């Protein structure tokens, strides 16, 4: 097998006690994606021969959530990082190299790993850091010539060793030809009673194998997550990076510190996004789209020149050009709006196609419907689409005028240019051009006197 064969082992077996969560630590999300999923994506971008993910705590939940084409290996006992890599040995090539990554180090990037792999060659590669606070981290020990000789975990470190600022990130490149022998010779005679992967550095030095350290260019790239505070810190770093990329690409963000993208955002020119907006899944924004404050948009395509007013929620929907949406509007899955549509405050649309120029400006529910062009919904219109068992469709033609406080009881069809009187409950089809009234006739009672309270 060629010497440049690359295997990747991702360690993801830890419980994450300090997360105080029933969810396995590696499933907590950064940018809307499980941390482990992010690490697998980065690993896959290196085109390795295979990727082995070592799981343990919450194995079934991890496999159910992160559905990837990788080799899943179970570590039944959590006996340390060295033991975890050892469980993956049967799936690693006899030759080549193994890169060790971690499922709770979500921001490691391809550029950093390529630099490490290039520096390591066929020797040992070690990614190091000089963090602001090295507390709790393993220290990099060097000799008088500056060569790395060992990694000492803080619990096993002397006072002098604890004074060292350079720390171990845990990310290693190891030659497969030596890996099995090194792992088999590990001892658990340490403060943790575990098999440390870091002890392989001293073994490499003992065998005359050069250790080539590479310092990570930014600490957050190799930062691990052990608690919710660290998770939140990395989330904000990640979101800041995404905001900066969008700003460089010409998107106006009124407050980059209050912007969240949990997916991918494709955009045209002169897009404006106000504060506190959340974008999830696949988003496409056309030219001159404006998104008001505190909107939540998930898996949506929004056409050019459309304005989304504050506090609107859009999910799994498609919006045409020159639309006016909100404030406080809700577009639910399968809402499909043509061009020049107006959807106002407290209007909800679900599984409905809305034709060009149609308006529903106030307090309206449109569900399971097909609506033509230039139709107007009066305030308080409700499409009653559910009979308690089944959903039914409503068809509304072009240039229909629906009076305020009407109920359209599906299944029902209103032809073109139909008008319905305010307060009507429409239960039968209405032909083109007709006026439909379905309400009780008003009665005025002559001589009626309103009761008064007893003044005594």
Swiss-Prot record:
Pathway stated in the Swiss-Prot or TrEMBL entry: Nucleotide-sugar biosynthesis; UDP-N-acetyl-alpha-D-glucosamine biosynthesis; N-acetyl-alpha-D-glucosamine 1-phosphate from alpha-D-glucosamine 6-phosphate (route II): step 2/2; Nucleotide-sugar biosynthesis; UDP-N-acetyl-alpha-D-glucosamine biosynthesis; UDP-N-acetyl-alpha-D-glucosamine from N-acetyl-alpha-D-glucosamine 1-phosphate: step 1/1; Bacterial outer membrane biogenesis; LPS lipid A biosynthesis
Major location category of this protein: cytoplasm
Annotated Pfam families: Hexapep, NTP_transf_3
Keyword annotations of the record: Acyltransferase, Cell shape, Cell wall biogenesis/degradation, Cytoplasm, Magnesium, Metal-binding, Multifunctional enzyme, Nucleotidyltransferase, Peptidoglycan synthesis, Repeat, Transferase
Binding site for acetyl-CoA: 379, 385-386, 404, 422, 439
Annotated region (Pyrophosphorylase), positions in chain: 1-228
Catalytic activity: alpha-D-glucosamine 1-phosphate + acetyl-CoA = N-acetyl-alpha-D-glucosamine 1-phosphate + CoA + H(+); N-acetyl-alpha-D-glucosamine 1-phosphate + UTP + H(+) = UDP-N-acetyl-alpha-D-glucosamine + diphosphate
Listed cofactors: Mg(2+)
Residue ranges, annotated region (N-acetyltransferase): 250-456
Positions with a binding annotation for Mg(2+): 104, 226
Active site: 362 (proton acceptor)
GO BP annotations listed: cell morphogenesis; cell wall organization; lipid A biosynthetic process; peptidoglycan biosynthetic process; regulation of cell shape; UDP-N-acetylglucosamine biosynthetic process
InterPro entries with a match to the protein in the record: Bifunctional_GlmU, GlmU-like, GlmU_C_LbH, Hexapep, MobA-like_NTP_Trfase, Nucleotide-diphossugar_trans, Trimer_LpxA-like_sf
Superkingdom, taxonomy of origin: Bacteria
Note on how the cofactor is bound: Binds 1 Mg(2+) ion per subunit.
Main enzyme class: transferase
GO MF assignments: glucosamine-1-phosphate N-acetyltransferase activity; magnesium ion binding; UDP-N-acetylglucosamine diphosphorylase activity
UniProt-annotated location(s): Cytoplasm
Region of interest (Linker), ranges: 229-249
GO cellular component, one term: cytoplasm
Stored PANTHER family: BIFUNCTIONAL PROTEIN GLMU, NUCLEOTIDYL TRANSFERASE
Alphabetized NCBIfam families for the sequence: glmU
Subunit structure: Homotrimer.
Chain's role: Catalyzes the last two sequential reactions in the de novo biosynthetic pathway for UDP-N-acetylglucosamine (UDP-GlcNAc). The C-terminal domain catalyzes the transfer of acetyl group from acetyl coenzyme A to glucosamine-1-phosphate (GlcN-1-P) to produce N-acetylglucosamine-1-phosphate (GlcNAc-1-P), which is converted into UDP-GlcNAc by the transfer of uridine 5-monophosphate (from uridine 5-triphosphate), a reaction catalyzed by the N-terminal domain.
Family affiliation: In the N-terminal section; belongs to the N-acetylglucosamine-1-phosphate uridyltransferase family.
Protein name: Bifunctional protein GlmU
Native source organism of the sequence: Neisseria meningitidis serogroup C (strain 053442)
